[in-house]
């Protein structure tokens, strides 16, 4: 289960372990916190918004500086988005053929916790995702049990 989640989000073992440790420190259910942190990563938000075809492509868009958060360039894929933040593509990225294709052809529905705007070039984090809104087929309790040994 851990490997399934880790590969789905494209994280190294160290990144995943750190995420678990922070989720464990926070109040609430550790497994849900962990999935929420995974979903709120900037590369995942770009993917969920339909700006990229895959999480790897979303990670590359972020790494290459094509993404703004609240008007400022952010090139760290692990950046954790907060409620109310606006994630948008920079002007140069909006003209890229691959980005246009992703938005037009894939036409992916964004989850309920994201609000689309500006022809798919912008997305607002409306609320923090809850477990029901996260569609990754992972049993997070097994991950928590593995790491809590």
Task: Indicate residue ranges for each PLM-predicted region.
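DNA major-groove recognition helix of helix-turn-helix
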Residues: 62, 73, 91
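Short, intrinsically disordered, mixed-charge
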Residues: 51, 63-64
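Ferredoxin-like alpha/beta domains used as RNA- or RNAP-binding modules
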Residues: 1-49, 76-149
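Short, well-ordered loop/turn sites that connect or cap secondary structure elements
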Residues: 55, 61-62, 81
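A contiguous catalytic/ligand-binding core that recognizes phosphate-bearing ligands
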Residues: 49-55
């Amino acid at each position: 289960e851990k490997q399934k989640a880790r590969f789905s989000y494209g994280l190294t073992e160290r990144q995943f372990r750190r995420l678990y440790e922070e989720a464990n420190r926070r109040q609430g259910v550790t497994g849900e916190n962990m999935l929420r942190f995974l979903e709120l990563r900037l590369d995942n938000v770009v993917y969920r918004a339909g700006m990229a075809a895959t999480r790897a492509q979303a990670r590359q868009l972020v790494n290459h500086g094509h993404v703004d958060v609240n008007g400022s360039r952010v090139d760290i894929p692990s950046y954790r988005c907060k409620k109310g933040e606006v994630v948008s593509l920079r002007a140069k990225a909006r003209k890229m053929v691959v980005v246009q294709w992703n938005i037009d052809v894939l036409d992916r529905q964004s989850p309920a916790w994201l609000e689309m705007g500006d022809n798919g070039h912008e997305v607002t984090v409306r609320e923090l995702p809850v477990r029901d809104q996260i569609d990754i087929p992972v049993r997070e309790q097994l991950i928590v049990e593995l790491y809590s040994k």
